[in-house]
């Protein structure tokens, strides 16, 4: 029997045959505006509601903005932070600014992966985290793509070793076929790709699970929506991308 972590995202656990296998490190890959951050927020929030503490690593946005973004969907994490069940790791500000001085977990040099991992370990242990999201892991190797696989492997050892089930957000360009860095797809346990394609003059969101160690999963591309309550995946519908895109 596979021990699974439910994402809690409507429709997502159906195409994962029940959820992400525990301790898996999943690469959440996609272009700009595809919903990667929202997916990771929703995953952490649903964990909190199920009694699973979490950690969010902010590499691309100010921690204050992260909390605002989450609250817009009704996911106010501040009470969980006060209870010691949720933490934001500030790997964005380098500790600069008045708001940053109020953050408990600050990475003073976000380009120092070793330092980031030390602060992340502290946060995971302090809150007893079961779920972690890093947004985005690509930021750690933008200047040196050759380090992509090594960076993901380092994070995987720590995250899996500490018993967490984790999402690493990975940025790709709109036209890029890969997953956001050379070799990262081999280092991750799972890959979920989010896309945005034009259909008859409208943008359609879809996702596909490229791989997921330890479980069967849907091999089809499914449409999803972003609502005011978060992401909804439609497991019974399929998006076909060829010379033209169609939904069935």
From Swiss-Prot:
Query: Is the keyword ATP-binding in the record?
Result: yes
Alphabetically sorted, this entry's keywords are:
ATP-binding, Nucleotide-binding
Entry binding sites for ATP: 30-37
S-S bridge residues: none
Entry GO MF terms:
ATP binding
Does the keyword ATP-binding belong to this entry? yes
**Classification via InterPro entries:** KaiC-like_dom, KaiC_dom, P-loop_NTPase, UPF0273_KaiC-like
Q: Which Pfam families match?
A: ATPase
Domain annotation KaiC: ranges: 3-247
Top-level division of the source organism's lineage: Archaea
| Similarity section | Belongs to the UPF0273 family.
HAMAP family associated with the record: UPF0273
Protein name as it appears in the record: UPF0273 protein APE_1505.1
**Organism per entry:** Aeropyrum pernix (strain ATCC 700893 / DSM 11879 / JCM 9820 / NBRC 100138 / K1)
């Amino acid at each position: 029997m596979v021990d699974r972590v439910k994402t809690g995202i409507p429709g997502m656990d159906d195409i994962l045959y029940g959820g992400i296998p525990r301790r898996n490190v999943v690469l959440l890959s996609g272009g700009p505006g595809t919903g990667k951050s929202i997916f990771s927020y929703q995953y952490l929030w649903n964990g909190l509601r199920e009694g699973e503490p979490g950690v969010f690593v902010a590499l691309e946005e100010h921690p204050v903005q992260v909390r605002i973004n989450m609250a817009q969907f009704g996911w106010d994490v501040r009470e969980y932070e006060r209870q010691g069940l949720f933490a934001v790791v500030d790997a964005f500000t380098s500790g600069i600014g008045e708001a940053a001085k109020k953050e408990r977990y600050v990475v003073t040099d976000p380009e120092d992966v070793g330092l980031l991992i030390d602060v992340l370990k502290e946060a995971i242990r302090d809150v007893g985290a079961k779920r972690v999201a890093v947004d985005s892991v690509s930021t750690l190797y933008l200047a040196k793509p050759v380090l992509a696989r090594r960076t993901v492997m380092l994070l995987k050892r720590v995250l899996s070793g500490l018993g967490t089930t984790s999402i690493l957000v990975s940025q790709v360009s709109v036209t890029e076929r890969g997953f956001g860095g050379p070799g990262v797809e081999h280092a991750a346990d799972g890959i979920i790709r989010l896309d945005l394609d034009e259909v008859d003059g409208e943008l359609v969101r879809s996702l596909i699970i490229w791989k997921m160690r330890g479980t069967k999963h849907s091999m089809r591309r499914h449409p999803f929506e972003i609502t005011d309550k978060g992401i909804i995946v439609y497991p019974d519908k399929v998006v076909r991308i060829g010379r033209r895109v169609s939904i069935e």
